Amino acid sequence: MKSRTLALLWLFVIPSARAGEDSAPKGHLIIHGGGQLTTEVIDRFIELGRGAEGHLIYVPTSNGDEDGKSLTTVPGYLRPEKFGKVSVLHTRDPKIADTDGFIEPLKTATAIWFSGGRQWRTMDAYLGTKTAAAFQAVYRRGGVIGGSSAGATVQGSFLVRGAPAGNQIMMAEGHLEGFGFLPDSAIDQHAIVRKRLDDMIPVIETHPHLLGIAIDEATALEVSGGCARVLGKTKVAIFDAQRWKKGEPRYFFLEKGQRYALATRQLLP
């Protein structure tokens, strides 16, 4: 009787574990802190996006409307000639973003890059629409999601500097939600160059379950299979309130090449 009971338990436990594995995204993230995009970072993005066999989608929506070319042209630093197909996806209208026709290019996408600018513009256009769901689908099926500056911040679940009134406001009511490709995270950029490191502290104090990530310029965090690795020139600051102790620094640095397990929040060898 005991063995039969154990067998029945396994019938329930094993499928549940497999379901968890199946639901994990198969894709990758390239979260870039702004400034120079190094050869190492862009080469890795192209590789993960399948290069000549891939389809790059460029999303310039965080840019302003002053320079129309920035909303219609893929920038040269992404080396679009390395991809088999390239598309630009942009609208300011959530109603358009919620249509089947608008998301058609995303059905074959292997790589998405979000531009810099102001992150609220991207979230106002796409959050809660079919486009946002299609972005997630690209990531879940194995594509790479990349972005720099504002395009880094939108990849977190909590949106910092999302206020239309100004990017010095870290928490703005009505503009607190990112796409959540990296769950339970808040992502800042230009961290060291612009002396922004302390700006993340009140965010994590208010929302201690979040992992705070502050990335410097010319530096990126690659996320693959639950592991984060630092690429580029400088470093990434990590804020984990669950490990804060009185009198100790509120963040520590991941240096170039270091790896970090996101589930356990531990450095990897």
Give the location of each predicted region:
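Bacterial N-terminal signal peptides that target proteins for export
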Residues: 1-6
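Hydrophobic h-region of N-terminal signal peptides that target proteins for export
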Residues: 10-18
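C-terminal and late-domain segments of enzyme folds
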Residues: 20-52, 63, 68, 77-79, ...
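Structural motif
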Residues: 30-31, 111-115, 146, 187
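ATP/NTP phosphate-donor binding region
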Residues: 46, 54-105
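Catalytic nucleophile loop
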Residues: 113-116, 135-159
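Glycine/threonine-rich flexible loop motifs
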Residues: 119-128
